[in-house]
Amino acid sequence: MGIWKWLVMASLVWPVLTLRNVYDMKIECPHTVSFGENSVIGYVELPPMPLADTAQLVPESSCSMDNHQSLNTITKYTQVSWRGKADQSQSSQNSFETVSTEVDLKGTCVLKHKMVEESYRSRKSITCYDLSCNSTYCKPTLYMIVPIHACNMMKSCLIALGPYRVQVVYERTYCMTGVLIEGKCFVPDQSVVSIIKHGIFDIASVHIVCFFVAVKGNTYKIFEQVKKSFESTCNDTENKVQGYYICIVGGNSAPIYVPTLDDFRSMEAFTGIFRSPHGEDHDLAGEETATYSIVGPANAKVPHSASSDTLSLIAFSGIPSYSSLSILTSSTEAKHVFSPGLFPKLNHTNCDKGAIPLMWTGMIDVPRYYDGIHPFTVFCVLSGPGASCEAFSEGGIFNITSPMCLVSKQNRFRLTEQQVNFVCQRVDVDIVVYCNGQRKVILTKTLVIGQCIYTITSLFSLLPGVAHSIAVELCVPGFHGWATAALLVTFCFGWVLIPAVTFIILAILKFIANIFHTSNQENRLKSVLRKIKEEFEKTKGSMVCDVCKYECETYKELKAHGVSCPQSQCPYCFTHCEPTEAAFQAHYKVCQVTHRFRDDLKKTVTPQNFTPGCYRTLNLFRYKSRCYIFTMWIFLLVLESILWAASASETPLTPVWNDNAHGVGSIPMHTDLELDFSLTSSSKYTYRRKLTNPLEAQSIDLHIEIEEQTIGVDVHALGHWFDGRLNLKTSFHCYGACTKYEYPWHTAKCHYERDYQYETSWGCNPSDCPGCGTGCTACGLYLDRLKPVGSAYKIITIRYSRRVCVQFGEENLCKIIDMNDCFVSRHVKVCIIGTVSKFSQGDTLLFFGPLEGGGLIFKHWRTSTCQFGDPGDIMSPRDKGFLCPEFPGSFRKKCNFATTPICEYDGNMVSGYKKVMATIDSFQSFNTSTMHFTDERIEWKDPDGMLRDHINILVTKDIDFDNLGENPCKIGLQTSSIEGAWGSGVGFTLTCLVSLTECPTFLTSIKACDKAICYGAESVTLTRGQNTVKVSGKGGHSGSTFKCCHGEDCSPNGLHAAAPHLDKVNGISEIENSKEYDDGAPQCGIKCWFVKSGEWISGIFSGNWIVLIVLCVFLLFSLVLLSILCPVRKHKKS
């Protein structure tokens, strides 16, 4: 066994040398301090250290909160250890012995009666440690319990334990008072009545930490309850220990006292402590696969001075996984046991010589109710090249993501609100934020407008009022802003710029004319090309006669040479010549008619009448004329005003509002009216028309409203999905059957064991084993560190529905229709023909947090014969017990001569949750909004518009106009208030007071308009009396007076909206903003443009006449500058 011990020692020492000695302990805090004596707890597993150094371990804290003094007292432990006998060469039950000694340990988790309660009242912390040891080394586990007030007092502090430094980090969750489980906030409660009152009842698996508190008294005889609960036959002689366990649930709770009969949380913990007494293991990362060597059963004396053995143990060697601190049960006085390298007997089916754990960690199932999910608010301000944003939520933010922002991990809490700051690097696109199940959009266009206004106002800071008034007009994005700038520049500096620009244009035209035309109107470029061609022809010799070598001037002359010279004749006078070059050249010198061809060419040329050219005309243009400048100035002002009015409101992308003029479109009913279109699931649709009789002057109002899609699924709740760590442990002993010993993993919820018993090969036994055919190698697989990660629901049926309302004259009808269903009235038929969806019957919906946050769609979720690593492998259904996965792999025992056998497993070791998270992008996801759910049904609306409905609307032409034409409903309008800004940025919200008389209900639409254009509408069902309607719109200008309108009628008074500025921009909910509105109103025409221009001009100067004065000053300055640069030409008197 000596060589094996040295190998284990090396494997334990090496990680200590390589790891850093500073470790993090995270304590999760809710962001409000609730009533009651709540405490929070955190713990951290530390690397192994030599057993001899544990006697000097004392926790030392630098935290501002004092540590409870009673933990500084020394606790006497009976240390039980084992050693091999010198006279035994082979392993057997008698080859080793136990030794009991008394040791003093300081700072272990020996809690006194009322210590936790006193620490809460005195605002002190409890810092202690547990030990998991073998015969050589110990792994400390440091615990810290603090009152919940510490969450408000501290952010971090440092604790020293031996050679290690632990950084305590207080991390606030988004939960108000509850515990964060599966990404949800829940409140464990012992009262089922209060659970039903507060919300949805559910069962959750929660982590719990328990400490034994020794106290004498008849009410603290813990084994009396053990006998009642587990039908034990133990008597008080064998089990005299008195005390109770004090537990903290979920890392944040009031103390729970175990056992307490009327608290089922307490009884759940009590059951876990005595059925699975070892609790969760203390394995570090990388210790999932380990080996034990069982030495054998042993007895020890506790205390060391006892006359007989009082405690049964099992000696082992290998990696320590479970606590080595326990309490002897056979004494009324608390006898503390420290057993490095030995498992104390914690199973109480046999009553004698047992112990109970000093500390216990595990999972219990408790009922709960959910904390509500609150809506959030987000706004952004311009910061450098990007934007700085803040999100708030009253009840906390459980998730916040943005595809174009860097979401900060630093959270701040203000009273009951949680604040999250994040930075967006780009503002050229709108910022989309997903938070608390909502999708909101920050329109960054307004941020850019604000930056523009700020810059222009800063440049002209001498007149800030004037600069701001002009800046808010210039900074409107798109063509409208450029048109505004052109209009102002033309008005102020047109008298200088018009002649200057004209001069530049004339210079360019004259340059072009000079290039392409001569004074005789001949194309100069063509002339140059012709001369180049002639010179090229001369260069290559084509104008030279082949016989006489004379260079001709015209092609006709060359042709005459080609006829006469071969016949020995002069081509000019036809005289006979010798057929040689010299004779011809001598004759040409004396010939009198060599100019014959040149004279013929001159006769064919006729004189042309020359007219003044383009260049001369451009030179004579009088661009300095005051008449020309005034005419162009007036023309440009009118043209730019029209262009400005036409561009005064941008047309946003569908499916949102399109600006139009006042009124409602009309349709003559010659034939049936049919509409066929597709509609995204997040969009509303409003269709409004005035149907007219083509034969007579009769009409009737039609108003159709289709609300956004509601997705409803009937589900079967599959339960909670867990993540866990799979451990592979080898337990070897040289003698005895495999069933002789109880291994610690037997009490794990999910475990599987394969035994190799009584091996007959020498190669599978170490050298100190007694021989062939003895001993056992037990290969154990078990799951620990179980953590609930999500809730799964299987879709049984799915339904897509929309609410349809129709106002036909005075007839008002509504109905909720499904896919392949229709709304049918006497004149109108609205049908959903089909739906394009990514959901189907049999799919499984998995939520990793609150249902409001959306989830994943699984097409192949395993509900039966689940193997470890499948989706749904570790489940806890509500109507069944804990479901463990199958482990389909096979074991193999690896043997080497004279060494301990090692188990190998060829199956999957990665949990299904970890596999899903590694490939999460391959799964379809969905977002939810307006969530309603029960155990059997879930309903939500899709904020992303990922689904589509095929809608068909049919209105028959057979309408009884005589009986339906008159609508008795009377509507009165009044504008109450306005919020927001004009322009195409964030927009404005107009509050309208609408009164309805003469009929009980009326479905119609209220618009937000100025004198020329309407910028938004809201479809609303009015009831008799006074109604408050809020209408949102985008657009308008500084002169717009926004009014509430119904058809052609508007409220008598209007209100001005604020100018877009550098203020914060709030996010807009996509569900509220996604709507398609079609009322057939005409587009803005020329008359509308002039009305809009007049309203703007009157508005820009209304209340700020200094702007007009400043503009006129600039105009006068330009006139003076014109007179200096372009003086009037003086004409001489005749």
Curated annotation (Swiss-Prot):
Region (Binding to the ribonucleoprotein): 516-533, 588-605, 592-603, 611-625, 1121-1134
GO terms under cellular component: host cell endoplasmic reticulum membrane; host cell Golgi membrane; host cell mitochondrion; host cell surface; membrane; viral envelope; virion membrane
Motif window: YxxL: 615-618
TM helices/strands, residue ranges: 488-508, 628-648, 1105-1125
Chain ranges of zinc fingers (CCHC-type): 545-565, 570-591
UniProt GO molecular function: zinc ion binding
Region (Fusion loop): 756-776
Gene Ontology biological-process annotations: endocytosis involved in viral entry into host cell; fusion of virus membrane with host endosome membrane; signal transduction; symbiont-mediated suppression of host innate immune response; symbiont-mediated suppression of host TRAF-mediated signal transduction; virion attachment to host cell
Keyword annotations: Disulfide bond, Fusion of virus membrane with host endosomal membrane, Fusion of virus membrane with host membrane, Glycoprotein, Host endoplasmic reticulum, Host Golgi apparatus, Host membrane, Host mitochondrion, Host-virus interaction, Inhibition of host innate immune response by virus, Inhibition of host RLR pathway by virus, Inhibition of host TRAFs by virus, Membrane, Metal-binding, Phosphoprotein, Repeat, Signal, Transmembrane, Transmembrane helix, Viral attachment to host cell, Viral envelope protein, Viral immunoevasion, Viral penetration into host cytoplasm, Virion, Virus endocytosis by host, Virus entry into host cell, Zinc, Zinc-finger
First and last residue of the signal peptide: 1-18
Keyword field contains Signal: yes
Stated family: Belongs to the hantavirus envelope glycoprotein family.
Protein name, UniProt field: Envelopment polyprotein
Species annotation: Hantaan virus (strain Hojo)
Taxonomic path: Viruses, Riboviria, Orthornavirae, Negarnaviricota, Polyploviricotina
Gene name of the record: GP
